[in-house]
Swiss-Prot record:
Degrades alpha chain of fibrinogen (FGA), and has strong caseinolytic activity. Cleaves oxidized insulin B-chain at '40-Tyr-|-Leu-41', '48-Phe-|-Phe-49' and '49-Phe-|-Tyr-50', and glucagon at the bonds '62-Tyr-|-Ser-63', 66-Leu-|-Asp-67' and '78-Leu-|-Met-79' bonds. It is found in: Secreted. Keywords: Disulfide bond, Fibrinogenolytic toxin, Glycoprotein, Hemostasis impairing toxin, Hydrolase, Protease, Secreted, Serine protease, Sialic acid, Signal, Toxin, Zymogen. Residues 19-24 form a propeptide. The active site is at 65 (charge relay system), 110 (charge relay system), 204 (charge relay system). Belongs to the peptidase S1 family. Snake venom subfamily. Glycosylated. Contains 8.5% of hexoses, 5.8% of hexosamines and 0.8% of sialic acids. GO terms for cellular component: extracellular region; secretory granule. Disulfide bonds join 31-163, 50-66, 98-256, 142-210, 174-189, 200-225. InterPro entries: Peptidase_S1_PA (IPR009003), Peptidase_S1_PA_chymotrypsin (IPR043504), Peptidase_S1A (IPR001314), Trypsin_dom (IPR001254), TRYPSIN_HIS (IPR018114), TRYPSIN_SER (IPR033116). Lacks esterolytic activity. Residues 1-18 form the signal peptide. It comes from Macrovipera lebetinus. This is Alpha-fibrinogenase.
């Protein structure tokens, strides 16, 4: 009953959505119901919306800037107006950040690891996604997904998550467009040159999936979204593998790479 009430609130949020949220897929298509079994929705009653990725039965990976009070985490969700029988709602038992004060920048440490209050079982619409065994190759075709806005600057939230394929680009492409980026960072630059395809408001924290592994976390991009085909910036998960695995193993004092 609680889950039904919350989903009703989410539907109302879509009907009345104004000018708030955090990053959605522009230029994509509705995901197939079985294409996003690891995708999590992070939500609270104020209407803050983000994505996340289930990486094992009790842990979700998202972006640090997606942290919110009274966070609710939905797994196995496809259509806001038509609940799946196996979808689950969880809350955060603990949240971990690279720095204790949750300090991050547009090019560094925008990563959050969430321990769920209860485990979830693999089911028809729920399954964890593997961490990367290697960094993604240049020009790899990867998939993004989320419930973010499908239009920009005016925001339009979909009832089902949207998916799109984008490409890993050279880091200097993002650096040339976003002059504030340093010479090196633990991020990935991804998009489709000269095409308006990419993440937008409400997609932040969601996955960049390459060859069945989570390689990136949607972090930030242009405003309006994918303006003139501008690529997005994604936290490079491979660089944080050791930190993630250490935290999950119980070493809560583990530190992120410098």
């Amino acid at each position: 009953m609680v889950l039904i009430r919350v989903l009703a609130n989410l539907v109302m949020l879509h009907l009345s959505y104004g000018e708030k949220s955090s990053e959605l897929v522009i230029g994509g298509r509705p995901c197939n119901i079985n294409q996003h079994r690891s995708l999590a929705l992070l939500y609270n009653s104020s209407g803050f919306l983000c994505g996340g990725t289930l990486i094992n039965q009790q842990w979700v990976l998202s972006a640090a800037h997606c942290d919110m009070e009274n966070m609710q985490i939905y797994l196995g969700l496809h259509n806001f107006s038509l609940p799946n029988m196996d979808q689950k709602r969880r809350v955060a038992e603990e949240k971990f950040f690279c720095l204790s004060n949750k300090s991050y920048t547009k090019w560094d440490k925008d990563i959050m690891l969430i321990k769920l209050n209860r485990r979830v079982k693999t089911s028809t619409h729920i399954a964890p996604l593997s961490l990367p065994s290697n960094p993604p190759r240049l020009r790899s075709v990867c998939r993004i997904m989320g419930w973010g806005s499908i239009t920009s600057p005016r925001e339009t939230l979909p009832y089902v998550p949207h998916c799109a394929n984008i490409m890993i680009l050279r880091y200097w492409v993002c650096r040339a467009i976003y002059g504030s980026l340093p010479a090196k960072s633990r991020t990935l630059c991804a998009g489709v040159p000269r095409r308006r395809i990419g993440s937008c408001l409400g997609d932040s924290g969601g996955p960049l999936i390459c060859n069945g592994q989570i390689q990136g976390i949607a972090s930030w991009g242009s405003d309006p979204c994918v303006n003139h085909g501008a690529p997005g910036v994604y936290t490079k998960v491979f660089d944080y593998n050791d930190w993630i695995q250490s935290i999950i193993a119980g070493n809560t004092a583990a530190t992120c790479p410098p």
